[in-house]
Amino acid sequence: MEYSYPLNPDWTTEEMTIVVQFLEAIERAYEKGIDTLELKEKYRAFKQVVPAKGEEKRIGIDFEKASGYSAYKVMQLVKNATTSKIKMQP
């Protein structure tokens, strides 16, 4: 699938990398499944770059429009997960 990640040009290269790694983890949750602990760690790092809820929501909406993958739905599943790995249903 060809699409671009919603990135802020004001972020440093390191910050962009952190955001992309989180969004790639969301992709893996849909495509292959992902370890819940790994995803939580990626989310914590993402929140260091994007602490504001409004910006987080905007990035999530833009990413879902581009990819079809919902970061919000994945994180809701992770929050309530009782297993060590999750895989989203298409």
Swiss-Prot record:
Coiled-coil portions: none
InterPro entries in the cross-refs: BH2638-like_sf, UPF0223
HAMAP family, per the entry: UPF0223
Similarity annotation: Belongs to the UPF0223 family.
The name this protein goes by in its record: UPF0223 protein lmo1058
Source organism per UniProt: Listeria monocytogenes serovar 1/2a (strain ATCC BAA-679 / EGD-e)
